[in-house]
Amino acid sequence: MHIHVLGSAAGGGFPQWNCNCPNCDGLRKGTIKAKKRTQSSICVSADGINWVLFNTSPDILQQIQEFAPLQPGRAIRDSGIVGIVLIDAQIDHTTGLLMLREGQVKREIYCTDMVYQDLTTGNPLLNILDHYCGVNRHDIPIDGKHSFSVEHAPGLRFTAVALKSAAPPYSPHRHDPHPGDTIGVLIEDLNNGKKAFYAPGLGEIEPHLPALMEQADCIMVDGTFWTDTEMLDMGLMSKKARDIGHNPQSGPGGMMEVLDGYPGARRVLIHINNTNPILREDSAERVELTRRGIEVAYDGMDIIL
């Protein structure tokens, strides 16, 4: 299995266009050791030819241009992307769908009922695509017991589980969470049995998650915030990290403590907010992650399982 990180930042990217926090300001001025990052997305393949895209960020065109296998050039119109799996309906994970509207071949999109509802009502991106390329929508089972496959992506099997999280602001059920608003996915390579667990939006470790995470050779999970009060402390938001569906890295029950329980797996943080000190490669927080054997995803990162 080949996992390629197309984008590793949370919504807004890094640096964020209107942000002058120490990280964003320092990156622009060249005074901190850090890498630019686009908004989070990965693609996965078992054969290096047919790729499944997870989420479509607003930066998808740039991300495709920077990863040659997604444009193999076999015909006058071509793509290495054979299917799109949407983890949720958040704007930073779906806006890129509009950038993929060209062509006569329908987009093969895999999403839950809740995500489909959001993307045909509150933010009707799928309705808009029907006026261009069109969409073949495939349902995703979320009970963790029934797997699904993506046509034309041989050698891969996917098992999804519902995660507690908030629906997008434009969702018809914004303040009434439903199973399927957000999912985590166990990705299995049927050729060698290797597995990866992908959950860029993970608010808490629910009882059904350890059984899936224990199977994984690689765990890629929510790296949005370092502390629960990160945005509060900077005066940027009135809510805590967990209030908006993101388990912070530090503190009791934080992501570091969780990942310490899976020492045999490769552990990678993704979907990193621009305020998070782990973006600074020489920060004390990054040193602590390294000491624990936890990696920080970056654009262009390749994971081979």
Curated annotation (Swiss-Prot):
Is Lipoprotein among the key words of this record?
no
Q: In which pathway does it act?
A: Cofactor biosynthesis; pyrroloquinoline quinone biosynthesis
Q: Pfam families recorded for this chain?
A: Lactamase_B_2
Q: Gene3D superfamilies under this entry?
A: Ribonuclease Z/Hydroxyacylglutathione hydrolase-like
Q: Which domain of life is it from?
A: Bacteria
The biological process GO terms on file are: pyrroloquinoline quinone biosynthetic process
Q: Which UniProt keywords apply?
A: PQQ biosynthesis, Transport
Q: What is the role of this chain? A: May be involved in the transport of PQQ or its precursor to the periplasm.
What the record says about family reads:
Belongs to the PqqB family.
Protein name according to UniProt: Coenzyme PQQ synthesis protein B
Q: Which organism is it from?
A: Methylobacillus flagellatus (strain ATCC 51484 / DSM 6875 / VKM B-1610 / KT)
Q: Which gene encodes it?
A: pqqB
